[in-house]
A protein has these predicted regions:
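N-terminal glycine-rich phosphate-binding loop for ADP-containing cofactors
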Residues: 1-152
Length: 152
């Protein structure tokens, strides 16, 4: 859901974090927190999921450069099998490539088709995009004197 339709690589968010390195997530977060004003909305999002990230790092599950991350490749009878981490249990199981929401299939038709859907997946994507765009608008004065300089 959080991939190409919203302008991210086709890997999606979690596979992208595996590629970059999960061990970098807390370092980037700490760096941002130390440099941002206290009223910056970024401070509100730090924390959720932190326990999962830290336990993954402690286990050596730092992504592709480690034993795995949110995903890992395993071998079964000589064939590569993609596994996904269950965020509740921490166990890996065969990745289910079937879309969980009808809106996920609509994403192939573009963002507006995805957002026109009425399911939890589309609502999640809409919430993420609205929060992201609101944050981008909030930081415009720190980046530029006007929005036109950014957009042009």
């Amino acid at each position: 859901m959080l991939g190409r339709p919203i302008g991210l690589p086709k890997t999606g968010v979690f596979a992208l974090m595996d590629l970059i390195g999960i061990d970098l997530i807390p370092k980037v977060g700490e760096s941002l927190q130390s440099r941002l004003d206290q009223e910056d909305p970024f401070h509100k999002i730090s924390g959720p999921g932190e326990d999962i990230i830290m336990s993954m790092i402690e286990e050596g599950n730092t992504g592709r450069k480690g034993k795995g991350g949110f995903y890992r490749l395993n071998r079964d009878d000589g064939k590569k099998v993609k596994e996904a981490r269950d965020l509740s249990s921490g166990e890996y199981r065969k990745a289910n490539r079937k879309a969980a929401f009808p809106s996920a299939k609509m994403g192939k038709r573009g963002l507006s088709a995805l957002m026109d859907c009425d399911d939890d997946g589309a609502r999640f994507v809409t919430d993420v995009l609205l929060d992201t765009l609101a944050y981008a608008a909030f930081i415009v004065p720190d980046v530029s004197d006007d929005i036109y300089s950014i957009d042009g």
